[in-house]
């Protein structure tokens, strides 16, 4: 009898044709096989859906109108059948032991969230890996361990589905920085979080392209400030501090300055 819990992987995609095969190949190569793969297409105009449909075991959900990553992720949450949920961006990659290590750590420690290491290929100085498994139960300790006020990326977490549904967590629509309020609340409501060595998420997005677009960068910066104000209000209402929040803001500004002074070369 198979007692391994099912993991639902939610992959939002908009015109990600050139990444689809690499993304889904990562999933097919996983040591862990109890997976529900939801590929949520956000009205792509390229061949993303056609490529995804060639891969076995992938459920394709198509949006009737372009709603953004938040809409796609929220739809995936509604369709999830797994005990755990993981959000996987189509242009990134994961190590072959990713889900096996996360699930085993979550089950062994009865954790609501398992926290993966991150390899940031666009900015290696922000890579964060774990050397040992550690369990956190205090809210501020969990905030500090995850640096969720600094890096709110939802794809770093394997999250118990019941936690998301019990607290009605969702991604805010029409936002650039939608991960931050979602991840922040998930960490707050979790009773136990475990850091997991050997589970690496490879973040491959080129941040320079965003920071070199003045109009879009201005919109993202304004949105980030609104999301930070949102989590500050939440923290005040629930009487706790947010470790790493100011550090994250300063690093974001320094990253902006660096890209403007030393634009990345392409080709």
Please give the residue ranges for each predicted region:
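Nucleotide-sugar donor-binding/catalytic module of glycosyltransferases
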Residues: 1-223, 261
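Generic detector of well-ordered alpha-helical segments enriched in charged/polar residues
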Residues: 140-144, 232, 251
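Non-catalytic, C-terminal membrane-associated alpha-helical segments of glycosyltransferases
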Residues: 222-226, 242-267
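Amphipathic alpha-helices of TPR/Sel1-like and other helical repeat/solenoid scaffolds
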Residues: 226-233
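Short, solvent-exposed, charged loop/turn and helix-capping segments
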Residues: 237-239
């Amino acid at each position: 009898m198979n007692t391994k819990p099912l993991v639902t992987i939610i992959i939002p995609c908009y015109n990600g044709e050139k990444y689809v095969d690499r993304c889904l190949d990562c999933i097919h190569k996983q040591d862990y096989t109890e997976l529900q793969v939801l590929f949520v297409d956000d009205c792509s105009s390229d061949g993303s859906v056609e490529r995804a449909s060639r891969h076995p075991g992938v459920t394709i959900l198509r949006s009737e109108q372009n709603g953004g990553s938040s809409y796609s992720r929220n739809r995936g949450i509604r369709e999830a059948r797994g005990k755990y949920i993981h959000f996987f961006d189509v242009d990134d990659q994961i190590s072959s032991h990713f889900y096996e290590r996360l699930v085993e750590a979550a089950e062994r420690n009865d954790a609501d969230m398992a926290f993966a290491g991150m390899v940031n290929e666009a900015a290696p100085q922000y890579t964060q890996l774990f050397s040992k498994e550690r369990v956190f139960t205090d809210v501020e300790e969990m905030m500090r361990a995850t640096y969720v006020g600094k890096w709110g990326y939802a794809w770093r977490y394997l999250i118990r589905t019941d936690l998301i549904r019990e607290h009605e967590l969702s991604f805010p629509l029409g936002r650039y920085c939608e991960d931050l309020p979602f991840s922040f609340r998930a960490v707050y409501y979790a009773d136990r979080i475990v850091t997991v060595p050997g589970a690496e998420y490879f973040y491959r997005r080129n941040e320079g392209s965003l920071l070199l677009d003045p109009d879009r960068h201005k919109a993202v910066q304004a949105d980030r400030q609104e999301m930070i104000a949102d989590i500050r209000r939440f923290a005040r209402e629930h009487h706790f501090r947010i470790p790493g929040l100011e550090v994250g803001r300063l690093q974001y500004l320094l990253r902006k300055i660096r890209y403007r002074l030393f634009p990345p070369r392409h080709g």
